[in-house]
Design a protein with these regions (language model features):
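Helix N-cap/beta->alpha junction signal
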Residues: 91-92, 144
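Acidic, Mg2+-coordinating phosphoryl-transfer loop and its flanking beta/alpha structural elements
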Residues: 137-177
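Substrate-recognition "cap/lid" segment bordering the active-site pocket of phosphatases
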Residues: 93-139
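Active-site neighborhood of HAD-like aspartate-dependent phosphohydrolases
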Residues: 1-58
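Generic beta-sheet signal
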Residues: 19, 88, 162-164
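Short catalytic/ligand-binding loop motif for oxyanion handling, primarily in non-cytosolic enzymes
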Residues: 17-20, 25, 94-98, 148-150, ...
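Short, acidic loop-to-helix structural element flanking the phosphoryl-transfer center
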Residues: 59-87, 93-101
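Short acidic-hydrophobic, aromatic-tinged amphipathic segments that line or gate anion-handling sites
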Residues: 117-118, 173-185
């Protein structure tokens, strides 16, 4: 009997694309807490409003340097119909052109069932949770710990976390240091079922 393919979503920056800047997450958390006038009571992410901020936001995303090691395993599992894969990036609409450039570079149309960017500029965790529910995903591979927690608490999908050197001490079972490690876990899950 043919197995139903696992439905898996992938974040773009820091997951499908290697992004060394993600190691600065702890630094940005400390800076935000110092600069913030009031205590943060919920998950919220910065949104660039002015044209200048949007230009800076584009420059910041240039830190996604190349396709991450492990991408070839997504291609194999997709080609073999073991997974239905989706790109769900919280990149705001001001980054649409760069998103499309990466889709072309990755030949995403031949690998992924669909690719979505945050064209309505929702808060990233809200956008991703909505798409995950809409698509009925089994897993979502994400490098932001706050978003992983939000996914686990607000969807039926299991968040697979690509951690970093500073956050690796946070206890979590489905924690990996690279896309390649996360894909090995997914392959084991498929082979086990």
């Amino acid at each position: 009997m043919k197995k139903t393919p696992l439905k898996i979503g992938f974040d773009l920056d820091g997951v499908l694309l290697y992004n060394p800047a993600r190691i600065f997450r702890p630094v940005t958390i400390v800076a935000k807490s110092i600069l913030r006038q009031k205590k943060q009571t919920k998950t919220e992410f910065y949104y660039p409003k002015t044209e200048f901020e949007k230009i800076l936001w584009n420059i910041v995303h240039w830190s996604s340097l190349y396709i991450a090691d492990g991408y070839d395993e997504i291609i194999k599992l997709s080609d073999n119909k073991n997974i239905q894969s989706y790109i769900i990036t919280s990149r705001y609409d001001c980054l649409k052109k760069d998103f499309e450039r990466w889709l072309e570079k990755m030949h995403a149309d031949t690998v992924f069932t669909a690719a979505f960017h945050n064209k309505n500029n929702l808060q990233p965790h809200v956008f991703k949770a909505q798409k995950i529910k809409e698509l009925g995903l089994d897993f979502f591979v994400e490098d932001n710990w706050d978003i992983v927690q939000h996914i686990n608490n607000n969807t039926h999908a299991k968040g697979l976390w690509i951690s970093n050197a500073f956050d690796k001490s946070i206890p979590y079972n489905e924690k990996f240091m690279s896309l390649k490690e996360a894909m090995a876990f997914i392959k084991q899950t498929i082979d086990r079922d």
